[in-house]
């Protein structure tokens, strides 16, 4: 029975008669949809691009095994109608970033609720709600942590009012030449999967990087080693996949190439090993014989679940061989020109990455990892907890009822913590912050300054990495404010493609130039001021003035290393947006984007609302709230 009967009359009418939008039908989305219909919401639109996977079933309770492979949105609708058969639910198996879902679409709703798992889609929905002037409730969970906040144009800060932590990245030379952490080997193994079975990407090369600036070697010795490495085929002359095909995907030849010959070649780069422990090549025959010598030890029973056991080198070599054979068969079944896509839930693909990563860890003297640990790191999986999703979904509805009651001033940003804070609160409410006057999204006249080298940055970089990736536009049009309205980038396919390889300076862009970027879909215009600089750091293509540089600094890298599983957003193949392009970096993905880890809140440190850290020590700072009685939706633990 719907709870709306117990609500005040005006609120009950808004609940039963108003139309709301739920974006995402995953962990939070399933709980939220159930809560909405039980509260009495009768007109709900639900959108999600994902299909149901077996791994979803432990927490996304609207789905059953028989639903695997079907649309999440459609099945969620069918399941939740059993709670409220009279509800009018419209399911959309689509991306929220589809141009069909324009500003007019968003204006149909009295409230939008996000249950997303990636930053790109969050940014987009944030802008659409600002353009349509519709309240948005944003949410996220990560393990035991959760967060809910309200966004209203002109009243509160928007999702993009403050820079998000820069995603952790790894230089290509570290991945290929000098891995020092298990995650480096896991990234290398994922790259190797794509090089052998998937879509090849030059930025995901796995062979030794001869251009590494740290490397130095004797040319004659290197040439001799290179000859030995190339006896089975030079992967620099032909693609890795073509070379592997020419060997018939022979596991022993692949093993020898990757774990012996390439490692021997790395050893010729003597400068790399002056302050590092050098890697130790693996020989297939020796690995097999060592395994026989240790047979008695191998037969000893291991404690724990199979996926949580760390095997020996011989076992991983065998797993490597078996997984290659299985993947070779799968690739052949798909036909010529086919590609496989790495999926953490595909056993052969996971076997391949587990074995390859562990063999490389052993070579570089690291402790090997269990399949469970590697799966968590490879997919950046924070174990999802159903009760966390349930708590956050409940809070979303409570905040929604405040909005529909016309009491948005009573809305709060609410943090769910793993442990109670010093005031014994597990749920901590913080006052909503006003809009950031310098925000390049919700300010009255959005404007930003970008520092770059106009003689090096191309139009394609401006389009893909700055306008689309950094400023989250979907279909941008960019013109130069030069009095002539020169079109630099057009959203019409092919119209300005010839401009892509040209440098910005080729169009007269210099220090002080101004670009106007428009996204018709998002009803969003951004003025970009160009600040020319030739003093940018190594590998830094651009910086947003007042923002963090587009590179992981030492402190950021240190923080990320502490919480590699928690720093993700838009790099996955999200449920509501397209997959992002990958450079020579680790792109990590998570089930639900992580919320802030905040046991208290401070107005001076707004970044706490976005950043998730592992250290959950309670802060002594007071919440920026007036002294008041505990709200009803705050749990006090005595």
UniProtKB/Swiss-Prot annotation:
Protein name: SUMO-activating enzyme subunit 2
Modified positions (Phosphoserine) in chain numbering: 207, 505, 548, 590
Keywords, sorted A to Z: Acetylation, ATP-binding, Cytoplasm, Isopeptide bond, Metal-binding, Nucleotide-binding, Nucleus, Phosphoprotein, Transferase, Ubl conjugation, Ubl conjugation pathway, Zinc
A GO-annotated cellular component: SUMO activating enzyme complex
Biological function: The heterodimer acts as an E1 ligase for SUMO1, SUMO2, SUMO3, and probably SUMO4. It mediates ATP-dependent activation of SUMO proteins followed by formation of a thioester bond between a SUMO protein and a conserved active site cysteine residue on UBA2/SAE2.
Gene: Uba2
PANTHER family in the record: SUMO-ACTIVATING ENZYME SUBUNIT 2 (PTHR10953:SF5), UBIQUITIN-ACTIVATING ENZYME E1 (PTHR10953)
Location in chain, cross-link Glycyl lysine isopeptide (Lys-Gly) (interchain with G-Cter in SUMO): 190, 257, 271, 275, 609, 611, 621
Tissue distribution: Broadly expressed, with highest levels in testis.
Ranges annotated as biased composition (Basic and acidic residues): 222-233, 548-561, 603-614
